[in-house]
Amino acid sequence: MKSIKPVLLLILDGFGHRTEGDDNAILHARMPVWSRLREQYAYGTINASENFVGLPSGQFGNSEVGHLNIGAGRIVQQDISRIDCDIEDGRFSSNDTLQQAMSKAQGSALHILGLLSDGGVHSHENHIHALIRAAQAAGVPKIYVHAFLDGRDTPPRSAETYLKRLDAALAECPNARLVSVTGRYWAMDRDKRWERVEPAYRLLVDGEGLFHAETGLDALKAAYERDENDEFVKATGIGAPVKMQDGDALIFMNFRADRARQLTSALTDPAFDGFKARQPKFGYYATLTSYGEAYSALPVAYAPQKIHNGMGEYLSSKGLKQLRIAETEKYPHVTYFFNGGEEQVYPGEDRILVPSPKVATYDLQPEMSAGEVTDKIVAAIQSGQYQAIFCNYANGDMVGHSGVFDAAVKAVEALDGCIERCVDAMLAAGGEVLITADHGNCEQMYDGEHHQPHTQHTTNQVPFLYIGRPAKIRAGGSLRDISPSLLAMMGLEQPAEMTGQSLIDFQ
């Protein structure tokens, strides 16, 4: 095989392109290296949201969707779109797995868990409403809804809207009621902070909340009086306490896996030891989508789509060595999601996980673990082992979600020196670099419509910076074009399954 030019892909998570705004952390940051590289090399912007990545119109992108599209080299129709279509066409209520769960609940109860918002990143309220209606129509006698509040992929204090819409749906379904409310910070942790998950678990399983309210709206009002935004609302029981009983059925309505896994482990894994608690013997426990190989025994309503000849698989088939590296918060994205939602590690694929700092929120340590990630990248480049290195820097997204503007500025400033070290090392090794992002976030830190911090993702385009030979970047691209561009940089033909195209016109 001819000599392959090594490449480095840097994914700056949540680092969107936006030219205006006093609330743009990137514009306010001191990033001389980033500015110089943009001037010196070929720079463009690409699409990372909506139909360009297999999402509905108006829906911003996210890390899972972004890395799926990047790794696949094609538009991947997302689960939210598949489920939306089934609801619209009337097929949702006849889904075999959902039917099984409702059947099992006829003599007991059906528990519906999920993130209640229209954020569209981890879940969508419309799916929860549709399941409530389906269960009512199927004659399920007791339908219990456990709502996780958002405030991260939605404005920090927006849950009133979603709770009111849930109340409207419940009003049409006399067998259903809301029984618990808690913020996603507790119920949807993904960093093994079991001290967060435990109070949410005890509320769900034993009906023992830290607080109690008669309605979801009352619970929210009390939480706001405690100065808790939606994400941080503490475990609150609603109405008469409800316990999960042996034989009950449960459906977890989050379609994104990473923040649903820990709670699912606590509820279903006999070997779970994160904390001591009663574990119900469910008659049926289903998940809306696959939560991964470790949960393969659980029924799934929407099985994953098989992606053949994505970037990782294709490089492996060519006998090339590749490295994936990220800190904890984004490690699943450069591995599991980049590989098309597959747990498999391909031959020749190495992985490095750098622990994220143990802080309550990342505005308290905006540099996160970027320095250590960079150390590992530089060492990997200098080792000469790898033809391709794929890295995610979490800062822009994780600190952007905090809504703290000054911290977001520091977060992206911390990346500037990291970028310089990576680029210098790769150029010295005779390689080339591509810098992009999976979606926007920290380029918009204030929500003018709601007059509060902007903590969610955006639909803005993202950077596409090629550092190597003289070139121009073609306009109109999207995340699906990143892998074909990398293959062009390496001098390799792209597989037929990749429908994206290289955006780099070498001069």
Swiss-Prot record:
Pathway: Carbohydrate degradation; glycolysis; pyruvate from D-glyceraldehyde 3-phosphate: step 3/5
Active site, per annotation: S63
Catalytic activity reported: (2R)-2-phosphoglycerate = (2R)-3-phosphoglycerate
InterPro entries noted in UniProt: Alkaline_phosphatase_core_sf, BPG-indep_PGM_N, Metalloenzyme, PGAM_B_sf, Pgm_bpd_ind
Gene Ontology process terms (BP): glucose catabolic process; glycolytic process
Keyword annotations from UniProtKB, A to Z: Glycolysis, Isomerase, Manganese, Metal-binding
Statement: the UniProt record of this protein carries the keyword Metal-binding: yes
EC number: 5.4.2.12
Binding site for Mn(2+) 1: D397, H401, H457
A GO term from the CC aspect: cytosol
Sample GO molecular function, one term: phosphoglycerate mutase activity
Residues that coordinate or bind substrate: H122, R152, D153, R184, R190, R256, A257, D258, R259, K330
Top-level division of the source organism's lineage: Bacteria
Residues at which Mn(2+) 2 binds: D13, S63, D438, H439
Cofactor: Mn(2+)
CDD domains: iPGM (cd16010)
Protein's UniProt keywords contain Manganese: yes
Enzyme class: isomerase
Cofactor comment: Binds 2 manganese ions per subunit.
Assigned protein family: Belongs to the BPG-independent phosphoglycerate mutase family.
Subunit-structure text: Monomer.
Primary role: Catalyzes the interconversion of 2-phosphoglycerate and 3-phosphoglycerate.
Protein name (record): 2,3-bisphosphoglycerate-independent phosphoglycerate mutase
Organism: Chromobacterium violaceum (strain ATCC 12472 / DSM 30191 / JCM 1249 / CCUG 213 / NBRC 12614 / NCIMB 9131 / NCTC 9757 / MK)
